Amino acid sequence: MTSGIMIASNVLLWGAFLALAALMLGVIRQIGLLHERSAPLGAMMIDHGPDIGERSPVFSMTTIDGVPVTVGRAVSPGRPSLLMFTGPSCPICQKLLPIIRSVAATEGADVILISDGTQAEHREFLRNHPLDGEHYVVSAEIGMRYQVSKVPYGVLLDKDGVIQAKGLCNTREHVESLFETTRVGHSTLQNFLKHGVEDASKHVH
């Protein structure tokens, strides 16, 4: 009789343990989903151009002010480069310019603004938004090579011209995420969050 009671108790304990484990797994998954929905999403990759980890194609260009610049390699030795695809009539690009400048200064990166359109449009844009150390290049070719379909779109290159991160950038968080992904070791912050949830689920098992 005592043996039967002990067996029943063990069965109940194991049942309670498994139920608790299943509940914890469900909670972890819900937290992950909530985190993805509530946290500012990182820059979204929407192009099909050169991949992260590949060396950037190189373009010998001249800035709108007539200064030669090589797009795809370090502007300053030892410093990363942020290629930001913009448009002179893009309101988000105009709002984002001081943010790009601030984040790049914090991260020690050179900024190359790459745009398309008429010279008149660019001159008007620059009258309203003067440059402050950024390189401004007018080129449809670079955007086509990277297959950028929407702006503002950022591509972060390391000091050797290797693509570290890229994605659509509509907010400060998006711009910052280009640099943050290199620190967390994932191509995008979405990928980092996804792997974090999966790793937590494995620990429960």
UniProtKB/Swiss-Prot annotation:
- Please name one Pfam family that this protein belongs to: AhpC-TSA
Q: Which residues form a coiled coil?
A: none
Q: Where in the cell is it found?
A: Membrane
Q: What main location does UniProt list?
A: membrane
> How is the protein disposed in the membrane?
Single-pass membrane protein
**Organism whose genome encodes this protein:** Methylobacillus flagellatus (strain ATCC 51484 / DSM 6875 / VKM B-1610 / KT)
Q: In which pathway does it act?
A: One-carbon metabolism; methylamine degradation
Which keywords has UniProt assigned to this entry?
A: Membrane, Transmembrane, Transmembrane helix
KW Transmembrane helix (keyword) present: yes
Kindly state one GO CC term assigned in the UniProt record.
Answer: membrane
Instruction: Quote the function comment for this protein.
Output: May be specifically involved in the processing, transport, and/or maturation of the MADH beta-subunit.
* CDD domains given in the database record: mauD
**KW Cytoplasm (keyword) present:** no
The UniProt record lists the Thioredoxin domain at 50-184
Highest taxon of the lineage: Bacteria
Its recorded name reads Methylamine utilization protein MauD
Q: Which InterPro entries match?
A: AhpC/TSA, MeN_DH_accessory, Thioredoxin-like_sf, Thioredoxin_domain
